[in-house]
Amino acid sequence: YQINTGLDNMVGGTGWSAGTWGRGTWNSSAEVTVETQLRLWSHDNFGEDLLINPRDSGIFYWDKTQGLTTRAVELSAATTGAANGTKTSVPQVVKQILVSDTDRHVIAFGSDGLGANSSATQGDGVQDPLLIRFSSQENAIDWFPTATNTAGDLRLGTGSTFMQAIETKREILVFTDKSLHSMQFIGPPLQFGI
């Protein structure tokens, strides 16, 4: 389905027509500045397919084998390519995604929590701005941690919200509003460390 691409820059309004229609009287200024946030997107390759995330929204999946005329679908609803199979606790609201180059985990920053149990197909829908979740290795749809997969999560200890993640050669730099963390792949049983 189609997703609104959003604004390409921050728009502020202070005069008549700032805010919702009919909010104030004709030719009167607004009491408070109204700002409309730009929409930020993150995306990364998962093999030949594409994972897409509009900030503070869900994760979408585009399957190359379906051709250029086929739109991306929500990862929790995808049924083709690497997204074909049993889905467990797929995040529903995320600030940014990336696929780690070293070990091919899909990582969701500023994510919602796990679903109610291991058979839940979606996360709980309540965004935690400091929660980092990662899928099982080489599997974009298995997010519920079990003894037989490598899915898991981490919570940042400082700051109040996740800002940005940047992947470097051997680590992922994770910025919050107050701190910078180094996230590294350390292998089983924890997978990642901060």
Predicted regions and their residues:
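Recognizes the extracellular SEMA beta-propeller fold with strongest preference
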Residues: Y1-I194
